[in-house]
């Protein structure tokens, strides 16, 4: 779980996302409150429930990017889902309970990797001994049993030294490694994923774990044996319990496109993929117990962050009960020309840096001048205003069109350099930007 302060979280988000300070502050406070809650005594800790967030803003302003970056910072079970993928219970499609099942699977994987990392040093020692046993088989007594030696032989120590120095990396050895059972692929209708997973687990357990002799280079065998030995040191039951605790206390669910499940106008018949989904989400957000293949998971303290553009619908179109369970509202602002300029230059892996690095692989140097960047930003903003406003995603389209000729000819122009200035941008984009019909289809 992350112990970063709100200011540190915002500072980290600033490296990748331009503007949207209110949204950054809201998620930073929510993340820090997870840590604060764990410092309370158990009685009060149970009473403190997370304050779920609803992020409202046009497409392409950074809602999903905030979620992506938050997942890396949280160091906690995190899942991002699309609200449009779900249908009401009893109808064809995914049920909302699968959100918690997927979150628990992610937590098990995360805890497993952490446990393997904690046991890595011991696993490396055991893997080293297994390789040395192949290189210098231990002495056996008259009954064919391996004798335990108090002190390793001089030859074994010499080989250990060579192994650690990498002198034996390319030598081939034959070792016995565990083989994973071949998975049985079961086709099931949507909504039956849990049953499918249980059947697959059952067939894998029936097959059991077998060992197979393989011929590998020592460096490859060492990696394989480390993973195998580390897995043996992990207790599966403890791992599952840790994962469930982690989900219940620190889990974060990000629900994107929640505006797409708002009811629009008067419709006849059941609305299974809109209002029905909202009703099914209610118990999850409020707190209930969900059955997963790893055990029962309580959702009372899972943090839910929902986001939507709300261009056609409005937050008040959500059912009142769900509105009440998303108490913190954050509005993200539409991007301006200045924001576009900052997006092109400020993030640690900005679009301009990406294109420079790609062209350098061909031995070609491209550089973006300040007036060139201003012109690119202005062109993207103009196209957004005259056609559909897709926010920062427009920059991808504009830049790809701008660099198209350079990308095509880069392999033939090794050693050359190109400055992308305002004149270059005008030459390649002005005609498209000015013609609304062309920009609608090309940009």
UniProtKB/Swiss-Prot annotation:
Known partners and oligomeric status: A double ring-shaped homohexamer of HslV is capped on each side by a ring-shaped HslU homohexamer. The assembly of the HslU/HslV complex is dependent on binding of ATP.
Binding locations of ATP: 18, 60-65, 256, 321, 393
A GO CC annotation given for this chain: HslUV protease complex
Encoding gene (name): hslU
GO MF, any single term: proteasome-activating activity
NCBIfam families, per the entry: hslU (TIGR00390), PRK05201.1 (NF003544)
Listed PANTHER family: ATP-DEPENDENT CLP PROTEASE ATP-BINDING SUBUNIT CLPX-LIKE, MITOCHONDRIAL-RELATED, ATP-DEPENDENT PROTEASE ATPASE SUBUNIT HSLU
Compartments where located: Cytoplasm
InterPro entries: AAA+_ATPase, ATP-dep_Clp_protease_ClpX, ATPase_AAA_core, Clp_ATPase_C, HslU, P-loop_NTPase
Family: Belongs to the ClpX chaperone family. HslU subfamily.
Cross-referenced SUPFAM superfamilies: P-loop containing nucleoside triphosphate hydrolases (SSF52540)
Role played: ATPase subunit of a proteasome-like degradation complex; this subunit has chaperone activity. The binding of ATP and its subsequent hydrolysis by HslU are essential for unfolding of protein substrates subsequently hydrolyzed by HslV. HslU recognizes the N-terminal part of its protein substrates and unfolds these before they are guided to HslV for hydrolysis.
Keywords (A to Z) from UniProt: ATP-binding, Chaperone, Cytoplasm, Nucleotide-binding
Name of this chain's protein: ATP-dependent protease ATPase subunit HslU
Classification via Pfam families: AAA, AAA_2
UniProt xrefs under CDD domains: RecA-like_HslU
Domain of life (superkingdom): Bacteria
An annotated GO BP: proteolysis involved in protein catabolic process
Organism, scientific name: Photorhabdus laumondii subsp. laumondii (strain DSM 15139 / CIP 105565 / TT01) (Photorhabdus luminescens subsp. laumondii)
């Amino acid at each position: 779980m992350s112990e970063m302060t709100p200011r540190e979280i915002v500072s980290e988000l600033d490296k990748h996302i331009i503007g949207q300070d209110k949204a950054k502050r809201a998620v930073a406070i929510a993340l820090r409150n997870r840590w604060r809650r764990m410092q309370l005594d158990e009685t009060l800790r149970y009473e403190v429930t997370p304050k779920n967030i609803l992020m409202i803003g046009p497409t392409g302003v950074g809602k999903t990017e905030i979620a992506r970056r938050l997942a890396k910072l949280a160091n906690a079970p995190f899942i991002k889902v699309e609200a449009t993928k779900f249908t009401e219970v009893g109808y064809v499609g995914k049920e909302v309970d699968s959100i918690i099942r997927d979150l628990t699977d992610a937590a098990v994987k995360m805890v497993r990797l952490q446990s393997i990392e904690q046991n890595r040093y011991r696993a490396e020692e055991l893997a080293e001994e297994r390789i040395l046993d192949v290189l210098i088989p231990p002495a056996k007594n008259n009954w064919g049993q391996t004798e335990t030696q108090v002190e390793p032989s001089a030859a074994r120590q010499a080989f250990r030294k060579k192994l650690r120095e990498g002198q034996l990396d390319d030598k081939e050895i034959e070792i016995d490694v565990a083989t994973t059972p071949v998975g049985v692929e079961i086709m099931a209708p949507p909504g039956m994923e849990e049953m499918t997973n249980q059947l697959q687990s059952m067939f894998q357990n029936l097959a059991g774990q077998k060992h197979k002799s393989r011929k590998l280079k020592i460096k490859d065998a060492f990696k394989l044996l480390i993973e195998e030995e580390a897995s043996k040191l992990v207790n599966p039951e403890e791992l599952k319990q840790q994962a469930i605790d982690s989900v219940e206390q620190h889990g974060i669910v990000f629900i994107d496109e929640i505006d797409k499940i708002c009811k629009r106008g008067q419709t006849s018949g059941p609305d299974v993929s809109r209002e029905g989904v909202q009703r099914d989400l209610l118990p999850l957000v409020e707190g209930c117990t969900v059955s997963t293949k790893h055990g029962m998971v309580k959702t009372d303290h899972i943090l839910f962050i929902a986001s939507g553009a709300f261009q056609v619908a409005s937050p008040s179109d959500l059912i009142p009960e769900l509105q009440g369970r998303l108490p913190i509202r954050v509005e993200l602002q539409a991007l301006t020309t200045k924001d576009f300029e900052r997006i092109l230059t400020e993030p640690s892996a900005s679009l301009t840096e990406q294109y420079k690095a790609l062209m350098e692989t061909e031995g070609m140097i491209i550089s973006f001048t300040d007036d060139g960047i201003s012109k690119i930003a202005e062109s993207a903003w103009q196209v957004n205003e005259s056609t559909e406003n897709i926010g920062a995603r427009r920059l991808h389209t504009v830049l790809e069109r701008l660099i198209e000729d350079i990308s095509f000819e880069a392999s033939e122009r090794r050693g050359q350099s190109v400055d992308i200035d305002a004149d270059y941008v005008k030459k390649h984009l002005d005609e498209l930007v000015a013609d609304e019909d062309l920009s609608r289809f090309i940009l």
